[in-house]
Amino acid sequence: MLPPSEPLPRAVVPRIALLGGESSGKTTLARALADALATAWVPEYGRQRWEELRATLSADELLRVARTQVDWEQAHAARSHGWLVCDTTPLTTLQYCLHDHGHAPAELHGLARRRYDVTVVCAPDFEFVQDGCRRDAAFRAAQHAWTLERLHEQGVQALTVHGSVQSRVAQMLDHLARHQGAAPALPEPLAAHANQSEQPWP
C-alpha cells in the first residue's frame, strides 16, 4: 500500500457510497476498501442508534439518523486521504422510514437524494447472517430491489459488486481506476490484499 497523501479540504473530498440490504457485506467492504485506499471510512450511525434504543425508530428519529450520518461524513472527511468511504447513506434511512411508517419527512426525502462521486451496491449473493439486529433474508432482498429502483429513478449509475471481500475490493479498485478522472490517485490495486486468502463473510 502506498503511504497516505495529505488530507484534502472537506469540501472537495470525493465520496464513495456503499449501499445494499442488511447482511450484504457493506461494513466489511467499507473497512477493506478504506484499508486498500489508505483512507478513512464512515460507520453506519443508524445501527448504533438502534443498538442504543433497541426499538423501532420513529420517523423523527430516523431523520435525526440521516442528519447525523451526513455530519459524520463531514467529520471523517477531515481525516480522509483522497477518497472517503461511506458505509450507507440517507437513502437507506429513507427506506427504513417508508417501510416502517409508510411516510417520511420531506427533509429526509431531500437527504436521500444526496449525491456521491461513486455509488456501489453490494449484492446479497451469500447466506443471510443474523446478528440480533437484522430482520430476515426476504427483507434484505426487498431492500436490494428498492435501492436499485430508487437509484435508477434518481439517475444514479451504480456499480453492483459480487463475491468475496477480496473480489469486491478488486472490482471497486478497477472501477475507480477506470473512472477516477481528476480524483485522487489510487494505490497499486490490491497491494494490501494480493497475498491474502479469500475471506468469508461475517
Regions found by a protein language model. Name each.
Residues 26:
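Conserved lysine of the Walker
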Residues 101-167, 171, 180, 187-191:
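A glycine- and Lys/Arg-enriched "phosphate-lid" helix/loop adjacent to the NTP-binding pocket
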Residues 1-14:
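Extreme N-terminal, non-catalytic leader segments
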Residues 18:
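Hydrophobic anchor at the beta1->P-loop junction of P-loop NTPases
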Residues 31-74:
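Conserved substrate/cofactor phosphate-moiety recognition/catalytic segment
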Residues 63-114, 121, 129:
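Glycine-rich phosphate-binding loop used to anchor ATP phosphates in small-molecule kinases
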Residues 21:
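P-loop (Walker A) phosphate-binding loop of NTP-binding proteins
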Residues 2-3, 159-160, 174-202:
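C-terminal accessory "lid"/substrate-recognition subdomains
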